[in-house]
């Protein structure tokens, strides 16, 4: 995978144990307003994904997905600016796609189609749908992996930035 795509789509590894996350004591930021219409990506793939997911998810779950986006966007712009130093637009587009699809596997229709966990089912569904919408393979795979691992925190190894962000932001976005 080209190095540029690694940065653009949130692939760089971070510690799975979250040792890279600022503590409450060290995170000295003031509250910020997040204007959704200003921070939400407007690319064709995001528009297609948003329409698809909005029609597939219950309203509460869809709204949860949008809240997760806002929390994660704020976390990155306040505490992880290095993550977006070279590819801000692409990173947040990928982030929006991960947020939209992260619970797609929880619907009764999608749970009834498989014996896999909702994370795996949703990840694979997102991979297939995003590629059909024209997302680059590396971007669709980043979203897929983040969804598969979003309920899998741990103490050892690493996870992609996108995966870690989904884990953390979903904890706030309930």
Protein language model features and the residues they cover:
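Active-site metal-coordination segments of metallo-dependent hydrolases
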Residues: 58-66, 109-121, 136
């Amino acid at each position: 995978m080209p190095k540029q795509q690694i940065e653009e789509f949130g692939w760089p590894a971070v510690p799975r144990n979250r040792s890279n996350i600022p503590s409450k004591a060290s995170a000295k930021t003031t509250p910020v307003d997040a204007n959704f219409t200003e921070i939400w990506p407007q690319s064709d793939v995001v528009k297609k994904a948003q329409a698809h997911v909005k029609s597939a998810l219950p309203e509460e779950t869809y709204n949860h997905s949008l809240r997760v986006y806002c929390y994660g966007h704020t976390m990155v712009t306040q505490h992880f600016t290095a993550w977006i130093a070279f590819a801000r637009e692409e990173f947040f587009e990928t982030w929006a796609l991960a947020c939209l699809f992260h619970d797609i596997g929880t619907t009764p229709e999608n749970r009834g189609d498989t014996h896999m966990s909702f994370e795996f089912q949703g990840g694979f569904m997102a991979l297939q749908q995003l590629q059909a919408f024209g997302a680059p393979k590396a971007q669709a795979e980043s979203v897929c992996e983040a969804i598969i691992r979003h309920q899998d925190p741990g103490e050892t190894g690493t996870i992609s930035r996108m995966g870690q962000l989904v884990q953390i932001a979903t904890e706030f976005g309930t």
